[in-house]
Structure formats: structure tokens, C-alpha cells
Amino acid sequence: MKGLIQRVSEASVAVDGETIARIGPGLLLLLGVERNDTLNEAKELCRKVLSYRVFPDEQGRMNVNVQAAGGSLLVVPQFTLAADTSSGTRPGFSLAAAPELANRLYGDFVAEASGLLGAGRVGTGEFGADMKVALINDGPVTFMLESGQRGSCTKM
């Protein structure tokens, strides 16, 4: 499971011209689910995202996590993060989870985040929808985080 986090001043996601979620200061997470991911990877990555220290402390160093900073989390499913880009000029998606598994694990991730951060501080995109994501990147600060099972996805 992969998550691209961006520290934001604000972020929102819209579907069919309607804003379905909006956050103020916090993290925008683009979440990619791979075919061998399980609930364990979802929980592990969630805890990693919420504890990752990307907000400034009193000395201006990145030393505070989103929870301690009082920030919010906007979770947007993005299957293209699971793409195989190792060869050629067209991405392959054989490493991406099937839609049913990806949707379930996306929901599990959101439930875990809501339980740990508080439901009022977690916004979501819409799985499978054509979404328009807007953000003001603060920094910019952007990191790719992955669950610990890296390397278990192999080509068939």
C-alpha cells in the first residue's frame, strides 16, 4: 500500500462539480492499494501517516504529526500510485488491487483514521469517481509512504 502525503493549508475534492470534502490545515493523502495488500497494511500505513512528523515545532523543524498539530486528513483513492512504471512509456496496472479489494481496504483505512484522529477531522474522496482535487501545498512538503510489505507484489 502506498500513500503520497502532502502538507496542505487547505484541500478539497469535487465530483461532478460538487465539493464532497474540504479540509483546512492538515494532510492530503493520495492512497494506492496494491493487489497483495491486507487490513494489516491499511492499519500500518494509517498509523504511519498519522504519526509522520511533517509539521513545524517551535524551532521550525518538522517534528510534529498531524494529530498533535490539530490538523485534518483528506484521503483520496488513487489506483495509479500502484502502477508499474519500470519499463516502457505506458504504465502497467497489474500490481494494483482489484476494485473490490481496493474499495474495501480504502474503507478500512478511512475507518482506522477516523477512529484515531476523529471522524470530524477526516474527509474522503469517492472511490471509482472522476475527482477534481484542489490543494494549497504548504512548503511544499510531500512524501511517499509505504506499508512494510514492499516487494511482495511480483509480476505474474
Swiss-Prot record:
Protein name as it appears in the record: D-aminoacyl-tRNA deacylase
EC id: 3.1.1.96
Coiled coil feature spans: none
GO MF terms, alphabetically ordered: D-tyrosyl-tRNA(Tyr) deacylase activity; Gly-tRNA(Ala) deacylase activity; Ser(Gly)-tRNA(Ala) hydrolase activity; tRNA binding
Lineage: superkingdom: Bacteria
One Pfam family of this chain: Tyr_Deacylase
Main function: An aminoacyl-tRNA editing enzyme that deacylates mischarged D-aminoacyl-tRNAs. Also deacylates mischarged glycyl-tRNA(Ala), protecting cells against glycine mischarging by AlaRS. Acts via tRNA-based rather than protein-based catalysis; rejects L-amino acids rather than detecting D-amino acids in the active site. By recycling D-aminoacyl-tRNA to D-amino acids and free tRNA molecules, this enzyme counteracts the toxicity associated with the formation of D-aminoacyl-tRNA entities in vivo and helps enforce protein L-homochirality.
Reaction catalysis annotation: glycyl-tRNA(Ala) + H2O = tRNA(Ala) + glycine + H(+); a D-aminoacyl-tRNA + H2O = a tRNA + a D-alpha-amino acid + H(+)
Subcellular location: Cytoplasm
Assembly and binders: Homodimer.
PANTHER family for this protein: D-AMINOACYL-TRNA DEACYLASE 1, D-TYROSYL-TRNA TYR DEACYLASE
Family recorded in the similarity comment: Belongs to the DTD family.
One GO cellular component term: cytoplasm
Disulfide bridges in this chain: none
Sorted UniProt keywords: Cytoplasm, Hydrolase, RNA-binding, tRNA-binding
Note on domains (UniProt): A Gly-cisPro motif from one monomer fits into the active site of the other monomer to allow specific chiral rejection of L-amino acids.
Enzyme class of the recorded protein, top EC level: hydrolase
Biological processes annotated in GO: D-amino acid catabolic process
Chief site of localization: cytoplasm
Motif residue range(s): Gly-cisPro motif, important for rejection of L-amino acids: 139-140
InterPro entries in alphabetical order: Daa-tRNA_deacyls_DTD (IPR003732), DTD-like_sf (IPR023509)
